[in-house]
Amino acid sequence: MSRRHSAEKREVLPDPKFGNIIVTKFMNSVMYAGKKSVAESIVYGAFGIIESKTKQNPLTVFEQALDNVMPTIEVRSRRVGGATYQVPVEVRSTRRQALGIRWLISAARDRNEKTMTERLSAELLDASNNRGNAVKKREDVHRMAEANRAFSHYRW
């Protein structure tokens, strides 16, 4: 890891269907081995299932799901005098978004539905209703931060 320059942030283009940058980031996270067209069909397919099930705009369901999954606080290890403490710190907005996307996708991959499209749509619907493994992950992280609140004065 270079100490001189931090990597420049690349500009992410909005997706073709909804014109939303977050959907593009989500698509890029779903993508395996550079197969963007496959990732695109998975995400848009999941959005189609959501629209047919809920009769709502899938973008609002997606944004609600992401909001319910994004953490506001997390713990980071800090070594003080030979002891390692789990120090609760606030999460930056870019990291919040990245973690939320990552947790949604990993929770969807762990589900039992037949295709990834079905898994993703089911996880997004669950997350938008404050259920599912992605929301559970966020609550676990928040619980961990709450349990280690005594060490918050070690923040840096």
From Swiss-Prot:
Q: What is a GO molecular function of this protein?
A: tRNA binding
UniProt entry tagged with the keyword RNA-binding: yes
Q: Which InterPro entries match?
A: Ribosomal_uS7, Ribosomal_uS7_bac/org-type, Ribosomal_uS7_CS, Ribosomal_uS7_dom, Ribosomal_uS7_dom_sf
| Any one GO biological process | translation
Which branch of life, at top level?
Bacteria
Q: Which Gene3D superfamilies match?
A: Ribosomal protein S7 domain (1.10.455.10)
Q: Which UniProt keywords apply?
A: Ribonucleoprotein, Ribosomal protein, RNA-binding, rRNA-binding, tRNA-binding
Q: Spell out the CDD domains in the cross-references.
A: uS7_Bacteria
Q: Which GO terms describe its cellular component?
A: small ribosomal subunit
Q: How does it assemble?
A: Part of the 30S ribosomal subunit. Contacts proteins S9 and S11.
What is the documented function of this protein?
A: One of the primary rRNA binding proteins, it binds directly to 16S rRNA where it nucleates assembly of the head domain of the 30S subunit. Is located at the subunit interface close to the decoding center, probably blocks exit of the E-site tRNA.
The entry's family comment says:
Belongs to the universal ribosomal protein uS7 family.
User: What's the name of the protein?
Assistant: Small ribosomal subunit protein uS7
User: Which species expresses this protein natively?
Assistant: Bradyrhizobium sp. (strain BTAi1 / ATCC BAA-1182)
The organism's taxonomy opens as: Bacteria, Pseudomonadati, Pseudomonadota, Alphaproteobacteria, Hyphomicrobiales
Q: Which gene is annotated as encoding this protein in its UniProt record?
A: rpsG
